[in-house]
Amino acid sequence: MNDFLNSTSTVPEFVGASEIGDTIGMVIPRVDQQLLDKLHVTKQYKTLGILSDRTGAGPQIMAMDEGIKATNMECIDVEWPRDTKGGGGHGCLIIIGGDDPADARQAIRVALDNLHRTFGDVYNAKAGHLELQFTARAAGAAHLGLGAVEGKAFGLICGCPSGIGVVMGDKALKTAGVEPLNFTSPSHGTSFSNEGCLTITGDSGAVRQAVMAGREVGLKLLSQFGEEPVNDFPSYIK
């Protein structure tokens, strides 16, 4: 885990934090019922895990998906603040629920430890960014946050400015026999970010191939602004 806050923090709810996306993980072992009643969660649990960040939504959701798979926690809320510190994308608020505080802490740790991987196919340039995600088996966080079908392969193909995402999605669907789940755009589902995002499902190999095809054309288009988009971590979609 890439911690930049003091690991000996006296705040008992603190689990860890990462410079990647300015992401912080916390656990409330027994949440106040009055607060729980006001939270926008799909199911009430006494123990809550929280993953919150300034930059990135898809990477944190996919990282949290691994935390869900590794524990008995359930994803009960995903929200998309318009953020990226003034960029074209999102931050994210993810809340998970369960009965065991130790399980919640483990899920948050797994998510924080996966950020370097799930940010591997985020490519940035001054003019915009691309994000690609893939999993052979989606779980509850990808389902609630991105509309994935639990237990099936899932891919996310996203471009900023949003028009690049439209072309990326078209290329992806023409490349492999996959099923489109949704297309979100600035006024339709992205919390007004300047992104076009296609989500897909289908055979694992086909989904991977489609995501890679979208990435290829997206990199070519974004580079037309005069700067090669770069990723800060090694690509994991190969």
Swiss-Prot record:
Residues that span the membrane, as ranges: none
Keyword entries, A-Z: Bacterial microcompartment, Disulfide bond
Localization per record: Bacterial microcompartment
Pfam annotation, one family: BMC
Domain of life: Bacteria
Biological processes, Gene Ontology terms: propanediol catabolic process
Keyword Isomerase applies: no
Gene Ontology cellular component list: bacterial microcompartment
GO molecular function, a single term: structural molecule activity
BMC circularly permuted domain mapped to chain residues: 14-125, 126-225
PROSITE patterns: BMC_CP (PS51931)
Main location: other
This protein's pathway: Polyol metabolism; 1,2-propanediol degradation
Gene3D superfamilies documented for this protein: 3.30.70.1710
Disulfide bond positions: 158-197
Listed InterPro entries: BMC_CP, BMC_dom, CcmK-like_sf, EutL_PduB, PduB
Subunit organization: Homotrimerizes to form a pseudohexamer with a central pore 7.5 Angstroms wide and 22 Angstroms long; the pore channel in the crystal binds up to 4 glycerol molecules. A disulfide bond forms in the pore, it is not clear if this is an artifact. The trimers pack into an array.
Described function: One of the major shell proteins of the bacterial microcompartment (BMC) dedicated to 1,2-propanediol (1,2-PD) degradation. Probably involved in a propanediol fermentation/reuterin formation pathway.
Domain remarks in the Swiss-Prot or TrEMBL record: Has 2 BMC domains which can evolve independently of each other.
Similarity annotation: Belongs to the EutL/PduB family.
Protein name, per record: Bacterial microcompartment shell protein PduB
Lineage: Bacteria, Bacillati, Bacillota, Bacilli, Lactobacillales
